[in-house]
Amino acid sequence: MGVSWVFEAEQTAKSVERILEGIGAELMGQFQVDVIPYNPATPSTDYATNIVMHHSKCPQSTFSICPKTDFRVSPKAVCDRGFDLILGKLAGGLVIDNAGKIEINGNEYNIHSDWTVRVGTATQGTTVKGVVVEVEYDPTVIIVQCREMMAEFIKQVFNKYHETQPEIFKITEKPERYSTLDTMWQYLQIAAKLRKKT
């Protein structure tokens, strides 16, 4: 996995896919991301909601994030899929919020072997909430090496969205390693906005 930039698109998924096919993107398959809130069984200010996430690119992993004000201070973990089974046994403390679950399903494209673009429709239950695009630059895992190039790619391909860089791009000044948790944080932030849409 390289460095990813995730954003909500204003167009339909088909419109975004046509743009990608117009620049020579090849359809590689499907992808799925889910964002599942687990709330404290008793409402309390002492305990935060735990967000459990999965990405089809990492089929053996479960991502767990307790969102705070920003990514750096939020408790987070990468676990194996067995973590989901453990959560089921913690029903006395954490209760799954099925109504708040966001699923993103769509297609994965490859462009000139260096870029992977995932275009998915976000749903909450049976309600369509929006279109989410993930642009991944595969050759590097160092943000400072590629963020300007990624902004230029997004500007050239979509003619917008390039000015709203992900939080991790803005706070990273040193050559730090990008991880899948950084991608999942971006999905979490978008899912939080999508839940508020009517």
Swiss-Prot record:
Protein family (similarity comment): Belongs to the Mediator complex subunit 20 family.
Transcription regulation recorded as keyword: yes
Pfam families, sorted: Med20 (PF08612)
GO molecular function: transcription coactivator activity
Lineage: Eukaryota, Metazoa, Ecdysozoa, Nematoda, Chromadorea
Localization: Nucleus
UniProt-recorded name of the protein: Mediator of RNA polymerase II transcription subunit 20
Gene Ontology terms describing biological process: regulation of transcription by RNA polymerase II
Record's function text: Component of the Mediator complex, a coactivator involved in the regulated transcription of nearly all RNA polymerase II-dependent genes. Mediator functions as a bridge to convey information from gene-specific regulatory proteins to the basal RNA polymerase II transcription machinery. Mediator is recruited to promoters by direct interactions with regulatory proteins and serves as a scaffold for the assembly of a functional preinitiation complex with RNA polymerase II and the general transcription factors.
Gene Ontology CC annotations of this record: mediator complex
Key words of the record: Activator, Nucleus, Transcription, Transcription regulation
Signal peptide feature range: none
InterPro entries per the UniProt record, alphabetical: Mediator_Med20 (IPR013921)
Transmembrane regions: none
Known partners and oligomeric status: Component of the Mediator complex.
